Every structure is written in C-alpha cells, then in structure tokens.
UniProtKB/Swiss-Prot annotation:
It catalyses: di-trans,octa-cis-undecaprenyl diphospho-N-acetyl-alpha-D-muramoyl-L-alanyl-D-glutamyl-meso-2,6-diaminopimeloyl-D-alanyl-D-alanine + UDP-N-acetyl-alpha-D-glucosamine = di-trans,octa-cis-undecaprenyl diphospho-[N-acetyl-alpha-D-glucosaminyl-(1->4)]-N-acetyl-alpha-D-muramoyl-L-alanyl-D-glutamyl-meso-2,6-diaminopimeloyl-D-alanyl-D-alanine + UDP + H(+). Belongs to the glycosyltransferase 28 family. MurG subfamily. It is a peripheral membrane protein. This is UDP-N-acetylglucosamine--N-acetylmuramyl-(pentapeptide) pyrophosphoryl-undecaprenol N-acetylglucosamine transferase. Residues 1-20 are annotated as: Disordered. Its EC number is 2.4.1.227. Signal peptide: none annotated. It comes from Mycolicibacterium paratuberculosis (strain ATCC BAA-968 / K-10) (Mycobacterium paratuberculosis). UDP-N-acetyl-alpha-D-glucosamine binds at residues 41-43, 160, 197, 231, 327. Pathway: Cell wall biogenesis; peptidoglycan biosynthesis. Keywords: Cell cycle, Cell division, Cell membrane, Cell shape, Cell wall biogenesis/degradation, Glycosyltransferase, Membrane, Peptidoglycan synthesis, Transferase.
Amino acid sequence: MNDTVKKPTGGRGDDPLPAGAALSAVAPHEPVSVVLAGGGTAGHVEPAMAVADALKALDPHVRITALGTARGLETRLVPERGYDLELITPVPLPRKPTGDLARLPSRVWRAVRETRAVLHAVDADVVIGFGGYVALPAYLAARGVSPRKPRVPVVIHEANASAGLANRVGARTAQRVLSAVPDCGLPGAEVVGVPVREAITSLDRAALRAEARRHFGFADDARVLLVFGGSQGAASLNRAVSGAAAQLAAAGVSVLHAHGPKNTLDLREPQPGDPPYVAVPYLDRMDLAYAAADLVICRSGAMTVAEVSAVGLPAIYVPLPIGNGEQRLNALPVVDAGGGMVVADADLTPELVAREVAGLVGDPPRLAAMTTAAARVGHPDAARRVAQAALDIGRTARLARGATGGRP
C-alpha cells in the first residue's frame, strides 16, 4: 500500500517555534526522525497529533511521519494539522472469532512489510505507538527494519485504563512505556496522563465564554448543556437527550448537541420563549463548545475524559458498553475526585437526563466545586512528557549511528 498523504503548506507542522525551544536539539542537518503510530479513531489520532505538536515545540528540526490507514480519521486530521501521513494495510484486531480473525496473519505481515519500508524510507530513529490499527504492525516492524538498521526504539503510550492487545504486545520490547493512569495492565508503565492539544490545555473557559456563546447563539447568562458522543455521535445519548428537550426547556436549559454526521434527532417543535436547542452534526470548534458549556453529557473514551477534565468541565459520563469496561474505568478517577458522575448506558433515559441536568445546572456552587475537582485530575504536560521521552531516545539512537557509522 504505502500511499503518501502530503501535508498542506502552512500547516501546524510548519509553525515557527519560540526562541530557545531547541537548545538541546540535534543539529539541523541531522534531524531526529519520529514515526507516530496511532490511527483509526479520534481517540488514537488526537493524542498522536498532540505529541506531534509538542515534538515541534521541543525541536523545530524534528522530522515527523504519521502512520495510518485509508479507513481512519487520520486521512483528514493528520494533513489538516500539517504532518505527513503514510498509509498501510489496516489490521483490525477482532474481539471475537470472526472472518477477520482468519485473515489476520496475512494482513499483519503485509502491514509489517509496508511499515518497514516506511521506517527505512524516513530513516526512523524512534517509533511512538498509541495503539489502534497501525500500532501492532509498527511495533513488529521496528524490531527489524533492514540489515543496516535492525531495530528502531519504541515508546508506547496507553491512553485507556485497560491496555489493548497491540500495546500489550509492543510493551514487551519497548524502551519506554507511558500510560494515562496507574494499573493499566502494562508492567513498568510511567503515568503521564493523556496527551491533549495545547489549544485545550491552555483554554480559559471563563475568558472565552462570551465569544463562545455568541458563536452558538446562546445568551450570555444561559445555562448550557453540551452533548456529544465522539466523532460519529452516540444513538443512546441522542435519544435520551432529545427526548428530554421539553423538560430541559422548561428548566431553562439551553442545549448544544453534536449528534454525529450520520444521525438525525427527532426533536419537537420549539415553543415561544424556549431556550435554544442547537443541533449540529459535528463540532469543529471544541474549544468554543467547552467554553460555552456549564455541563456535558458524553462518552468516556480516554481522550474525551482527558479533554473534559483538562478544561474543568463538570460531566455526566455514559460509558460505551463494549469491550472490557475500559470506558467506565477511564472516568473513575474524575468521578472519584468529584468532577463528574457515571451513568450506565442502559440507565440513560429522558427522565434521568431532565432530573440530573436540571439539578446540576441549578446548583452553581456544586458546579464550581466539580469544575475545580475535574481540573485537578488533568495532566496538562502529558504531550510534552511523551515527546521529550521520544526525543531523548531518538537522539541517542541517531548519535549512536553517527559514532559507529551505521546502526548497531
């Protein structure tokens, strides 16, 4: 496969860096080459892009190449952020025996061959893996690229509270293993949090609130509920919240609801004097959405929890009821700290939404306490820590090659 998606000129990967940002960088004529393996869903792509931005901030000469597949969100998100993307064969790891499982070995080795070609072409010094469809081939390929370059060091980041198969395999030979939370199932993992883009970690909700509410058409003094279910929406959240529209309006609650590009909402006709119910397929400006909101109802994927807690937004988390319950585990640190609550997907009804939302938005002191608690759980420096670990390892690898005239 090995298709290349080039970054647009003027993208984030080309941004100028602050003076002194690269004091410890390798000389410009020998830039460190970093390959990011984290494609498929936004939960894998966004942490990778946050780390890419942090790499550029630490070393403006670093070469960054992202691995992805033609079916993943990375085909849009990576070029938009200004980075090069190399496409390989997708390797979905089925949770249950299916036809995909029977085809897995041939797909894996095809993807490994393609990834080895990429690592060789970009002269990779280090691979950073985030799990997902491209991570397993990247970890296997890094074990042996060519006779001249038999091994590329690997840094792994596990965002979920329960590590996935790809990262469990990769962690066995990785140079560094980093995680969002303790006890993720990877021995020796160092807790750094989930990498979140700087636009979110530096977001001042209070300072941006007036602009954000004007952007979405809410009054300055509105009580705003934000609802989203990930990049594709969530049917159960859509049904429960839209079904509570009348009760929410009666309680004076405005709603900003991202229902997903493939979904629609069955909303009643608004009555005169009702606060706005703004329904959109997708939110391109999550910074404004977070700033406009007083409360959010959302899933609890690792990236969602990291962003919501980073901005100090009180949350009602509704874990996706699949897998090993990792979404519920992702939310527990914030919930235990007092920054949110968890509602099982099966228990999410219009009546519950109306009751809990009205109770929370009508209690400003409680919301303020939840805001403080949520913000305490966040790790705003996670992206920088992952990037620094990778640069340290990559520089060592490149310097070793320079000292020996080739790869050890």
